[in-house]
Design a protein with these regions (language model features):
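Extended beta-strand/beta-hairpin segments
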Residues: 1-53, 60-145
Length: 145
């Protein structure tokens, strides 16, 4: 394994049902709960929400990196993410992700798609999930294959 550039550490007790999660530096300190849609009381966050924020922020940073390399000014980029919890045939669960990337200063649809594809190749979350979960991407409203 390559030398780590950064290591994040967290401690969780109680899981997603009635849990608590905290990063080692205290920057994140959250109650973990079952989503209201699944019978929870909606008084905390859940792993899917945390994954949605993490993936979207990581993807936006990856996009900024590839845009800089390609000498493109992307302006105010926004990434909307959706993380869906799905059942599996084995009575387990899996997730799927949708990332809707808005690049308002990139009017050329082909260029927007090229940037999003390039970001998907370098994003650590994309690399970690590739081949394991379904990830649907859109660039300025245009779905990518």
């Amino acid at each position: 394994m390559a030398k780590a550039l950064y290591t994040a550490r967290a401690h969780v007790t109680g899981g997603r049902i009635n849990g608590h999660g905290r990063t080692s530096d205290g920057a994140l300190d959250v109650a973990l709960r079952v989503p209201k849609e699944l019978g929870g009381e909606d008084d905390g966050t859940n792993p899917e929400q945390l994954f949605a924020v993490g993936y979207a922020s990581c993807f936006e940073s990856a996009l900024a990196t590839v845009a800089r390399r390609m000498k493109e000014d992307t302006g105010d980029v926004a990434v909307e993410s959706a993380v869906m919890l799905l059942p599996t045939e084995e009575r387990g669960f899996k997730i799927a992700v949708e990332l809707d990337v808005s690049l308002p200063s990139i009017e050329d649809a082909a260029k927007a798609v090229e940037l999003v594809r390039a970001a998907h190749r370098v994003c650590p979350y994309s690399n970690a999930t590739r081949g394991n979960i379904d990830v649907a991407l859109t660039a300025n409203g245009q779905p990518l294959d």
